[in-house]
Amino acid sequence: MSGGTFPTSPAFTSVNIQANNPSIVTLASSGRRQVKTQNTQFWSFKATLPPMTRAQWAPIAAFIMTQRGPRFPFNVQLPQYSFTQGNLNSPHVVEINGAHDAGDTTISLNAWTDSGKSTTLTQTDGLKAGDFISFAPDHNKVYMVIEDVDFSSGSGSLTIEPGLQVDVSGGEGLVYDNVSWNVFLMNDTQEFQMNAGNTVGYELEFREVL
């Protein structure tokens, strides 16, 4: 067994999220600055679970053991970040309108009020700046919404960072709730803290797979 989805219970009590943009900065004696970026971006996290009983801890420990340190990628949802702050909700359906190339930061969207796509959606603040989204079904990268998104007669314009990491096709779905990150453990060694009262504490670090 490997991969899979990190258990959702108990939920993380805190999550520290980092946006990483690998760059090389050169400072000349004149004070001029040169920056070379690698045109890639990834998220990394430090997450803490609440004190757990042995029964709560056991399935989490078993899951972590199957990952064999950083070897296998797995999916994780973060209760603090995996859901939109906007007014989109199930069964609203949002799809990409037309093909977009890797590097694009503005994405045209179509939206409907129902899964049958019988009625186009008009909704202010459908998505909010700071939301996290991804594209279905085979695009694992997670992006941040940079500007609020309104939908008028089924159309909307989405601004994201970073730019698209791969080309996307028209009709691909937008995931705005239950967003999952595809990640791997950062450390070879995983440490579980046994506390007074027979509770277990656990903090883990993981990084987005590109």
Identify the meaning behind each predicted range:
Residues 1-210:
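Extracellular/virion structural assembly segments
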